[in-house]
Swiss-Prot record:
Residues 15-104, 127-215, 275-365 form the EH domain. Residues 241-255, 365-378, 705-724, 843-855 have a biased composition (Low complexity). GO terms for molecular function: cadherin binding; calcium ion binding. Residues 778-792 have a biased composition (Pro residues). Residues 386-553 form a coiled coil. The lineage of its organism: Eukaryota, Metazoa, Chordata, Craniata, Vertebrata. It is a peripheral membrane protein. It is found in: Cell membrane; Nucleus; Membrane, Coated pit. It comes from Homo sapiens (Human). InterPro entries: EF-hand-dom_pair, EF_Hand_1_Ca_BS, EF_hand_dom, EH_dom, Spectrin/alpha-actinin. The gene is EPS15L1. Residues 618-835 are annotated as: 15 X 3 AA repeats of D-P-F. This is Epidermal growth factor receptor substrate 15-like 1.
Length: 864
């Protein structure tokens, strides 16, 4: 976790104006936000590597917003200054005192710096101070650091080994295998530049050479030799000999050949610089322990890879190992690789002995034995003493040379031992420093471990809390699932109940609809029945009123008949004149009693005559109600009259209007005890004979009404001939009962013969006027009307002598009694005429009923 940001007053104690100028370059509009691209372009001018800049960005933008505000940009500038000053890039180093950051840009105010004494050295003062601190931490010995001590520091940079080897070669300016303070600063400077993706130069540029090293002349390709060891004290003993030699030389007694060999000038090395650099890279890769030497085991694979023989490789190894140490330094390894390259590429065999230009530069400081040997025997002067002295001098010189050789060998051994001791000391110091570093790392690891333990404990607590919460949530989820399941089951049951209720509701609604339809149909049927009942009641009332009138007429007729009987019987001794007067009186009485009624039949002469002017105005004369068949289209009683809309349009098919009985199922008068008036009678029909037919054989009795009086109560004629004998069709008893309605179920049967069958041949009432057109029979031929009897004359004639022709005409019960008499069947106020709309006696134009007429009645208008 990133440390909390430090206030700006502590982060930037000085140089606020400089930081403000930097911020103005990236945010000239002062929006308070610096984008990632603008900040990256500006920070790259610092010369730092992308890795360091990425770390700086992460620290400056800890929340990962993708941009920097003013405070974050100041933190980034401060971290850049830390990196340029050699400090670690962390937020904890923001409080350190350090120079402001520098950016390679013309607009940067730090590009132009005042000249100083050390301005020509590339290592800045602050870097030098930092490198000096690191140098002191490595515990240098006599101001020098060996390769073993510098190696861990260089390895921490994670640079490739060849780059680190090149850095070592460039920084070891005096080639002594150690780095002093300035050389270490150069090495660290090169390492930091390499970390910033800058290439390491092949040769050290003059700007990187420390000022302390520039006083020495460095020849190209030459390397300064190690400082020689101080001469031993006993070497001073050879001074007299030198002096004597000098004296001898000055006297010219010795040959110039016997003088000491002079120092030879420095020659170039046979190994080219480019090959040397390439061989050095191979050496750094081979020198895994970085001790500056490679053993035979380390280079064996490289040498064997060349394909040369082992003897030749052993000879090359012996030539390169000039000091016979069993190891090769960097220059010796380069020389050996040069010999192998010459043999492989050019076929040049290595020499047997090294020439002066083949000796590595680091090995040229040690003089080899004088190949000329000691001083040669001088020319003999002929003086024995001088010759002895010369020989003694030569012997002393040889001894001196051998002693010097021994001294050099001893000094070399001492140097080797000292070097070994130094190396052991270095190893000890290195191990000590490594131990200290390990201890520090151990302490850091322990601290981190403690911190991790604390975090682990916290995480365990958090984990336990989370687990507890998970358990609680799991229990809650399980309980919720249980509730959901129960609710789902309840919901399902409720849905089932709802579906059942809906189905029951639908069924009830359908049943309600059916009942409503049935009720509606029943209401329509009831209304129809009520209308029919009302119409029937009206007809009954009319029939009752007419019946009462007929009763009165009958009584009057009976009284008249009784008077006639009395007159005829001679009870009062009256004459025929009195009988005629009585007849006239009865006629007047009848006319007076029936004056308000209009008999539609009037008299037979008028009834059956063709003179329409003598007849009473017929209400059915202007329009024939039977001109068209009202039931031609459809039979209203064929089926259920309430099955469909009773007001719907009638069907066009021809059906029987009385095909179905509307009272078949429910007769409102079924429970009455009185017999049906229209029920089929077992007795003879009173209308089987025509009352208007003339009796062919009159009885001997002069009374024409003795046997054929239809209104006589004491008539002895048979019940079959008397239409009113036993059963009065207009009696009050039949209409008082509840079963006074006609039985329409028997309408299809042929009706009995009517009272007009004898006179009209049964055509008057033989057919049902409401019968279908197909069932209507043809009418019989018309017969002339019977002649009426002559009225009695004024002469008195005995009763015994009277014949049928002389018998006075009996009053016609259907004859109108007065001029103002009306039709008893005509509709009155308060009475309904059942035949008001359909007149069965309307005249017909044809003798036979036509197909267009549905009437089954005979046409009485043409009967004469």
């Amino acid at each position: 976790m990133a440390a909390p940001l430090i206030p700006l007053s502590q982060q930037i104690p000085t140089g606020n104006s400089l930081y403000e100028s930097y911020y103005k370059q990236v945010d000239p509009a002062y929006t308070g936000r610096v984008g990632a691209s603008e900040a990256a372009l500006f920070l790259k001018k610092s010369g730092l590597s992308d890795i360091i800049l990425g770390k700086i960005w992460d620290l400056a933008d800890p929340e990962g917003k993708g941009f920097l505000d003013k405070q974050g940009f100041y933190v980034a500038l401060r971290l850049v200054a830390c990196a340029q000053s050699g400090h670690e890039v962390t937020l904890s180093n923001l409080n350190l005192s350090m120079p402001p950051p520098k950016f390679h840009d013309t607009s940067s105010p730090l590009m132009v710096t005042p000249p100083s004494a050390e301005a020509h050295w590339a290592v800045r003062v602050e870097e030098k101070a930092k490198f000096d601190g690191i140098f002191e931490s490595l515990l240098p010995i006599n101001g020098l650091l060996s390769g073993d001590k510098v190696k861990p520091v260089l390895m921490n940079s994670k640079l490739p080994l060849d780059v680190l080897g090149r850095v070592w070669d460039l920084s070891d300016i005096d080639k002594d295998g150690h780095l002093d303070r300035d050389e270490f600063a150069v090495a660290m400077h090169l390492v930091y530049r390499a970390l910033e993706k800058e290439p390491v130069p092949s040769a050290l540029p003059p700007s990187l050479i420390p000022p302390s090293k520039r006083k020495k002349t460095v020849f190209p390709g030459a390397v300064p030799v190690l400082p020689a060891s101080p001469p031993p004290k006993d070497s001073l003993r050879s001074t007299p000999s030198h002096g004597s030699v000098s004296s001898l030389n000055s006297t010219g007694s010795l040959s110039p050949k016997h003088s000491l060999k002079q120092t030879q000038p420095t020659v170039n090395w046979v190994v080219p610089v480019a090959d040397k650099m390439r061989f050095d890279e191979i050496f750094l890769k081979t020198d895994l322990d970085l001790d500056g030497y490679v053993s035979g085991q380390e280079v064996k694979e490289i040498f064997m890879h060349s394909g040369l023989t082992q003897n030749l490789l052993a000879h090359i190894w012996a030539l390169a190992d000039t000091r016979q140490t069993g190891k090769l330094s960097k220059d010796q390894f380069a020389l050996a690789m040069y010999f192998i390259q010459q043999k492989v590429s050019k076929g040049i065999d290595p020499p047997q002995v090294l020439s002066p230009d083949m000796v590595p530069p680091s090995e040229r400081g040690t003089p080899g034995p004088d190949s000329s040997g000691s001083l040669g025997s001088g020319e003999f002067t002929g003086v024995k003493e001088l010759d002895d002295i010369s020989q003694e001098i030569a012997q002393l010189q040889r001894e001196k040379y051998s002693l010097e050789q021994d001294i050099r060998e001893k000094e070399e051994a001492i140097r080797q031992k000292t070097s070994e001791v130094q190396e052991l000391q270095n190893d000890l110091d290195r191990e000590t420093s490594s131990l200290q570093e390990l201890e520090a790392q151990k302490q850091d690891a322990q601290d981190r471990l403690d911190e991790m333990d604390q975090q682990k404990a916290k995480l365990r607590d958090m984990l336990s809390d989370v687990r507890q919460k998970c358990q609680d949530e799991t229990q809650m989820i399980s309980s919720l699932k249980t509730q959901i399941q129960s609710q789902e089951s309840d919901l399902k049951s409720q849905e089932d109940d709802l579906n059942r209720a809906k189905s029951e509701l639908n069924r009830l609604q359908q049943e309600e609809t059916q009942l409503e339809q049935s009720i509606q149909a029943g209401r329509v049927q009831l209304e129809t029945i009520i209308k029919s009942l009302k119409s029937t009641q009206d007809e009954i009332n009319q029939a009752r009123s007419k019946l009462s009138q007929l009763h009165e007429s009958r009584q009057e007729a009976h009284r008249s008949l009784e008077q006639y009987d009395q007159v005829l019987d001679g009870a009062h001794g009256a004459s025929l004149t009195d009988l005629a007067n009585l007849s006239e009186g009865v006629s007047l009485a009848e006319r007076g009693s029936f004056g308000a009624m209009d008999d539609p039949f009037k008299n037979k002469a008028l009834l059956f005559s063709n003179n329409t002017q003598e007849l009473h105005p017929d209400p059915f004369q202007t329009e024939d109600p039977f001109k068209s068949d009202p039931f031609k289209g459809a039979d209203p009683f064929k089926g259920d009259p309430f099955q469909n809309d009773p007001f719907a349009e009638q069907q066009t098919t021809s059906t029987d209007p009385f095909g179905g009985d509307p009272f078949k199922e429910s007769d409102p008068f079924r429970g009455s005890a009185t017999d049906d008036f229209f029920k089929k009678q077992t007795k003879n029909d009173p209308f089987t004979s025509d009352p208007f037919t003339k009796n062919p054989s009159l009885p001997s009795k002069l009374d024409p009404f003795e046997s054929s009086d239809p209104f006589s109560s004491s008539s002895v004629s048979s019940k079959g001939s008397d239409p009113f004998g036993t059963l009065d069709p207009f009696g009050s008893g039949s209409f008082n009962s509840a079963e006074g309605f006609a039985d329409f179920s028997q309408m299809s049967k042929p009706p009995p013969s009517g009272p007009f069958t004898s006179s009209l041949g049964g055509a008057g009432f033989s057919d049902d006027p409401f019968k279908s057109k197909q069932d209507t029979p043809a009418l019989p031929p018309k017969k002339p009307a019977p002649p009426r009897p002559k009225p009695p004359s004024g002469k008195s004639t005995p009763v015994s002598q009277l014949g049928s022709a002389d018998f006075p005409e009996a009053p016609d019960p259907f004859q109108p009694l007065g001029a103002d008499s009306g039709d008893p069947f005509q509709s009155k106020k308060g009475f309904g005429d059942p035949f008001s709309g359909k007149d069965p006696f309307v005249p017909s134009s044809a003798a036979k009923p036509s197909k267009a007429s549905a009437s089954g009645f005979a046409d009485f208008t043409s009967v004469s």
